């Protein structure tokens, strides 16, 4: 079968960093190829070389059998290569049709927009994807899943033969993911080639035909998915065996550090639990169960309407995140790009931002040498891959950004560390490193609350697990009692709480 798109021997270097070295990718008609690798493996750089955002230093790009160089996203798009980014590029205040044909609206012979034709053409594109809504609907009124379908329709409007999807299910529900997979199968049947970039093993084995593996900017292998197992694919990605994905530290917790009694707030109803020194408390539940809301009430980011919180035997009241920090409670947000990091600032500035009081003199000036030493120590401890501490954090991979976010929390010397989805969007290798860090914090006596939608992660890392359902606590289990079936039953409200006090 002749490839629609071939990239061979691609090199790309930046000052101090060799991003790609001999990288390769083949995309075939009617097949879905997964592009996988750890964060920083070169996947994003390869896509930018492909679409003309970056100029390759060496190598060839063959499009429909002819050697080609694209001068930018517009030229690759017009040639028939569409890309759907992780962050959707839509304008909520415009209709679906206006978004699809933005900048290339249909006009009549008088130079005015031909709305009737534009909406009719947009409706045809939606019908191709078997979507039930019309193109006169505002994009802002759609769910994230439906907005993604609009992005696909927009790509199809360019008659795209190859469609690149970057982490397409990151913000989707299970139902929306299944809808997306139906559309991908339809696109396959039309003879289009799909590049599917994802960290989610389950999805790769469900929807992809082939897989290309990158590691450290190099092409490692191209295989048929059917010939692989999850373990063999992960080994190719990280270059080593992952014998123990969840390295649990078997150390008995100490005395009670945090006690929460009858806590209420937005989306949180009458929740009580305890947390011990040197303990990892897992928090499980379905999307919308109130897990993040509970953590924000505890930390002070959302108002507490009633209930009590005691820390080391003393009552604490957190009316703001500053109160949480002052009392030794640190919250690492699930949305690091919106709540956790300032992407335009450097690694150093992000890491020390909430701990500047430790580096300040009486007059308010900073002890820069102390700040730099602390940041340097954390970069080394956390194995943060960055050219320097002055690098803009937005240029780091997701796993390294997450390490910086956690390091920033630890710089404030907390007693309680709340990690909300700490490995979301992080590759398997970086996940293992984060788990090892969490165990290190536990060994040092830090009390950790681990909120996660990944059940194996909660089961593998936690000493004890509580489950949320519709704002209430629906279950509490020891490590020995907890199974995926038990947690799921509690998550859907089918189990009464098991008190382990």
Swiss-Prot record:
Its membrane topology: Peripheral membrane protein
GO terms assigned for molecular function: ABC-type D-ribose transporter activity; ATP binding; ATP hydrolysis activity
Keyword line: ATP-binding, Cell inner membrane, Cell membrane, Membrane, Nucleotide-binding, Repeat, Sugar transport, Translocase, Transport
Enzyme Commission code: 7.5.2.7
InterPro entries: AAA+_ATPase (IPR003593), ABC_carbohydrate_import_ATPase (IPR050107), ABC_transporter-like_ATP-bd (IPR003439), ABC_transporter-like_CS (IPR017871), P-loop_NTPase (IPR027417)
UniProt keyword annotation of Secreted present: no
Principal subcellular localization: membrane
Protein's UniProt name: Ribose import ATP-binding protein RbsA
Lineage: Bacteria, Pseudomonadati, Pseudomonadota, Gammaproteobacteria, Enterobacterales
The gene coding this protein: rbsA
């Amino acid at each position: 079968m002749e490839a629609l798109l071939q990239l061979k021997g691609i090199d790309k270097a930046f000052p101090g960093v060799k991003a790609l070295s001999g990288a390769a990718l083949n995309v075939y008609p009617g097949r879905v190829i997964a592009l996988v690798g750890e964060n920083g493996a070169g996947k994003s750089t390869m896509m930018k070389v492909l679409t003309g955002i970056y100029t390759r230093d060496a190598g060839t790009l063959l499009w429909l059998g002819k050697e080609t160089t694209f001068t930018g996203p517009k030229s690759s798009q017009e040639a028939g290569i569409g890309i759907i980014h992780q962050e959707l590029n839509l304008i909520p205040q415009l209709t679906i049709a206006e978004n699809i044909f933005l900048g290339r609206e249909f006009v009549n012979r008088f130079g005015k927009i031909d709305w009737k034709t534009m909406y009719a053409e947009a409706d045809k594109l939606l019908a191709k994807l078997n979507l039930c809504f019309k193109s006169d609907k505002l994009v802002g009124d759609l769910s994230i899943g439906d907005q993604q379908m609009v992005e696909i329709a927009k790509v199809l409007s360019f008659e795209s033969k190859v469609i690149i999807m970057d982490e397409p299910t990151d913000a989707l529900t299970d139902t929306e993911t299944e809808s997306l997979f139906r559309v991908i199968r339809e696109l396959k049947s039309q003879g289009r080639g799909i590049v599917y970039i994802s960290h989610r093993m389950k999805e790769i084995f469900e929807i992809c035909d082939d897989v290309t593996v990158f590691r450290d900017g190099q092409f490692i292998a191209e295989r048929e998915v059917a010939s692989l197992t999850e373990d063999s694919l992960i080994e190719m990605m990280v270059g080593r065996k992952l014998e123990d994905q969840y390295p649990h530290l078997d150390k008995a917790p100490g005395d009670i550090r945090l006690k929460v009694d009858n806590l209420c707030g937005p989306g949180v109803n009458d929740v009580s639990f305890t947390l011990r020194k040197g303990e990892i408390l897992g928090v499980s539940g379905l999307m919308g169960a109130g897990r993040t809301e509970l953590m924000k009430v505890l930390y002070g980011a959302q108002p507490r309407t009633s209930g009590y919180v005691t820390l080391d035997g003393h009552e604490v009241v957190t009316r703001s995140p500053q109160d949480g920090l002052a009392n030794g409670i640190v919250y690492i947000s699930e949305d690091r790009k919106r709540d956790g990091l300032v992407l335009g600032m450097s690694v150093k500035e992000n890491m020390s931002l909430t701990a500047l009081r430790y580096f300040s003199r009486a007059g308010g000036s900073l002890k820069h040498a102390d700040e730099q030493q602390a940041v340097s120590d954390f970069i080394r401890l956390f194995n943060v891959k960055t050219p320097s501490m002055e690098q803009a954090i937005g240029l780091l991979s997701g796993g390294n950004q997450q390490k910086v976010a956690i390091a920033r929390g630890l710089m404030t010397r907390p007693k309680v560390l709340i990690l909300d989805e700490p490995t979301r969007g992080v590759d398997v290798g970086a996940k293992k490193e984060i788990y090892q860090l969490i165990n290190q914090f536990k060994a040092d006596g830090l009390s950790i609350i681990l909120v996660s939608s990944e059940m194996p992660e909660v089961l593998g890392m936690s000493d004890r697990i509580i489950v949320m359902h519709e704002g209430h606590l629906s279950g509490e289990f020891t490590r020995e009692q907890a199974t995926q079936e038990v947690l799921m039953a509690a998550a859907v409200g089918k189990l009464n709480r098991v008190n382990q006090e």
